[in-house]
């Protein structure tokens, strides 16, 4: 099994709903508000970054070498929800993002054995080590947005999503998931690849 978060997104390629694709951002507004509600309190609570519980993980790994299972469950669920919303907004699927888990968008996490497989000192330097990954990730995100715009035009005019563009957009999402797993969720000590593959 990989030591990185694996991303599985089943893309709807054919028979796409042109009408919902045309107004996708507006249709996604309610679930975007729901998703953003997790980060609303992030400014007032130390250790919360974008809704993810980070400081409790850092402290528990540093002092006890334990990753609290309830924090892991929350962070997993929030990242999966974020991925379902991203898949919908980026026109990869016509299925409205469920606030519960589904099989269209699935993330597979590395086994951490309650934190025993993780170095207790790595959380202190991971954020610094991840800076080049974030910078490259911004370039990849722009690339994915350009591909999504082209694919969106294809969906609303022809009713299908080009396979090549879908694969590349999913690779960018997977890249960000690996980065989040390393630097934010702290579920791996293995440095993520700079490659999209």
Tell me the role of every PLM-derived stretch:
Residues 1-197:
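Membrane-proximal intrinsically disordered regions of secretory-pathway and membrane-system proteins
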């Amino acid at each position: 099994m990989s030591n990185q978060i694996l991303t599985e997104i089943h893309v709807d390629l054919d028979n796409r709903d042109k009408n919902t694709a045309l107004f996708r951002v507006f249709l996604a507004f309610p679930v975007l508000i729901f998703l953003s509600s997790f980060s609303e309190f992030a400014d007032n609570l130390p250790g919360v970054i974008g809704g993810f519980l980070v400081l409790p993980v850092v402290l528990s790994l540093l002092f006890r070498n334990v990753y609290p299972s309830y924090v892991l469950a929350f962070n997993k669920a929030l990242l999966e929800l974020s991925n379902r919303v991203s898949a919908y907004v980026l026109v990869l699927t016509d299925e409205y993002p469920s606030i519960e888990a589904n099989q269209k968008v699935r993330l597979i996490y590395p086994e951490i054995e309650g934190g025993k497989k993780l170095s207790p000192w790595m959380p202190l330097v991971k954020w610094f080590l991840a800076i080049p990954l974030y910078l490259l990730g911004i370039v990849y995100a722009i690339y994915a947005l350009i591909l999504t715009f082209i694919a969106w035009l294809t969906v609303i005019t022809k009713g299908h999503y080009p396979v090549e563009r879908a694969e590349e957009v999913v690779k960018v999402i997977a890249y960000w998931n690996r980065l989040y797993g390393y630097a934010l969720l702290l579920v791996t000590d293995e440095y993520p690849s700079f490659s999209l593959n």
